[in-house]
Amino acid sequence: MPEYRSKTSTHGRNMAGARALWRATGVMETDFGKPIIAVANSFTQFVPGHVHLHNMGQLVAREIEKAGAIAKEFNTIAIDDGIAMGHSGMLYSLPSRDLIADSIEYMVNAHCADALVCISNCDKITPGMLIAAMRLNIPTIFVSGGPMEAGKVIGVANIQPERRLDLIDAMIESADDNVSNRQVEEVEQNACPTCGSCSGMFTANSMNCLTEALGLSLPGNGSYLATHAGRKELFLEAGRMIVEITKRYYEQDDETVLPRSIATKKAFENAMTMDIAMGGSTNTILHLLAVANEAGVDFKMADIDRLSRVVPCICKTAPNNHDYYMEDVHRAGGIFAILKELDKAGKLHTDVYTIHAPTLKDAIEKWDVTNPENTRAIERFKAAPGGVRTTQAFSQNRIWKTLDLDREKGCIRDVAHAYSQDGGLAVLFGNIAERGCVVKTAGVDESILKFTGRARVFESQEAAVEGILGNQIVAGNIVIIRYEGPKGGPGMQEMLYPTSYLKSKGLGKACALLTDGRFSGGTSGLSIGHASPEAAEGGAIGLVHEGDTIEIDIPKRSIRLVISDEELAARRAEMEARGSKAWKPENRDRYVSAALRAYGAMATSADKGAVRDVSQIER
């Protein structure tokens, strides 16, 4: 029987000083001996996905205390990728994932907490907390802030029909010379109407959905709107459940509630299967690889490639399809509706554990909104957007009269009526990316699934943006942005502005983009990222010359620099001959802080999840 970790600092004569300090935090004499639950919040006023989390930690804490445990809240950092986008701030986004994981490890281990509640929401916060959960392997539950409502705009002087929109529309239209200043202003004012993570299937929402598929959060966690009053119950239930599973582990020796018992190889395959089926962000691949690495699970790019070939796309939302947003996914039954359709097609391992049901199979049955007997599930997934601008959580209680149960033409479809039999994400291999690169196929037009073009080479995102806005890119070009990987950036910037500007210039279906950097979950089009190994690690993307021909064949999962092996070897030898200047960008003027240099010194390429490898600096 495992012993409560907290006894280290709460029991024994020699811990009198520690107990004195615990008392100063509000712990009473009768509390000693109760489990101590750490509540890792990520509230910040910088990020709309986190601005409403101010009181969430205490909401969970009070429920924990009612259930018979001690709750202690602390905070982590949270970076808004959208605000950090397009300037040097984006260098800090991915490295913050590791800082978040480290900070949680430090706080939980320093204070000997017995269990953990992770209150996350946006892009790097959820994966950072997942990494911490795997590292600590104590009872853990995730509850996120929820997605924002989709924006709406009527159009200038009510001439245009009403349309829904999001952050990406503001970025694209701001660079489109055919869109007036007034139209841009209207889009800007309406794109992000409420608190919550951005309204499409971008990175934040993708990751929060994946915590459901992994079995570490409650049903609805990824799709229940931040503004809806019903979401409050997720936080309250998380507070009660963490105490329950904590006692099951420490008092009943039930290891099935531990993160590493839940997030097994089968669970990672389930999560990736669901991700492919819903056309999630390519960043999810990066993060799942990193989380699996921390969990000690042998889950690699080859596994993702294998799954991508057999899983169809059965849910297609913004940015890949502007008919549907997260609020529509929720109305259709949420993530468990997607999981049900995948299970019917034999695509899942349903014998895995979850924190809220004995097995995934049990959970799918319990949360099936097509079963009229599941009244709790039906009530939860009728939650609708309020349509009122607000930064307040739980501020409206509007409900849909009916659910979207149309599995032929609705938001979530059965496998027979899939949006495409090819999944929403794919891994490509070839001489330019020997360890793979990633594309969100759900966002690629069918006309360019096979594409051959001439390389336009840029040594930084800034140079590429300047080239695109300066009309240097024409139809048939493949924009190469290199030395933007985890090590080369350092920090692996998102390339949302280059892809958005290509659309602004009318080149969204006429060009491709290849980078060793990554993309926002809001990216669509023939945008291929995570080229591994990256240029700074000796990857062949660093050997591409201006005007080279590159062939892309998504159905065959291939990408090829059209030169001979001998020519490629000669270019590599020429690069190596540059000595200390080899595998470094030319003429790039970029300030890199000591913190970023430290990250870059340990960072691995994207095919390994961009995790830190301390052995690279050990002597």
UniProtKB/Swiss-Prot annotation:
Its cofactor is [2Fe-2S] cluster; Mg(2+). It is an enzyme of class 4 (lyase). It catalyses: (2R)-2,3-dihydroxy-3-methylbutanoate = 3-methyl-2-oxobutanoate + H2O; (2R,3R)-2,3-dihydroxy-3-methylpentanoate = (S)-3-methyl-2-oxopentanoate + H2O. The active site is at S520 (proton acceptor). It holds the Pfam family ILV_EDD_C. One of its GO terms (cellular component) is cytosol. GO terms for biological process: isoleucine biosynthetic process; L-valine biosynthetic process. Keywords: 2Fe-2S, Amino-acid biosynthesis, Branched-chain amino acid biosynthesis, Iron, Iron-sulfur, Lyase, Magnesium, Metal-binding. Binds 1 [2Fe-2S] cluster per subunit. This cluster acts as a Lewis acid cofactor. Mg(2+) binds at D81, D123, K124, E494. One of its GO terms (molecular function) is magnesium ion binding. Its EC number is 4.2.1.9. The modification N6-carboxylysine is found at K124. Pathway: Amino-acid biosynthesis; L-isoleucine biosynthesis; L-isoleucine from 2-oxobutanoate: step 3/4; Amino-acid biosynthesis; L-valine biosynthesis; L-valine from pyruvate: step 3/4. Functions in the biosynthesis of branched-chain amino acids. Catalyzes the dehydration of (2R,3R)-2,3-dihydroxy-3-methylpentanoate (2,3-dihydroxy-3-methylvalerate) into 2-oxo-3-methylpentanoate (2-oxo-3-methylvalerate) and of (2R)-2,3-dihydroxy-3-methylbutanoate (2,3-dihydroxyisovalerate) into 2-oxo-3-methylbutanoate (2-oxoisovalerate), the penultimate precursor to L-isoleucine and L-valine, respectively. Homodimer. PANTHER family: D-XYLONATE DEHYDRATASE (PTHR43661), D-XYLONATE DEHYDRATASE YAGF-RELATED (PTHR43661:SF3). This is Dihydroxy-acid dehydratase. It comes from Neisseria gonorrhoeae (strain ATCC 700825 / FA 1090).
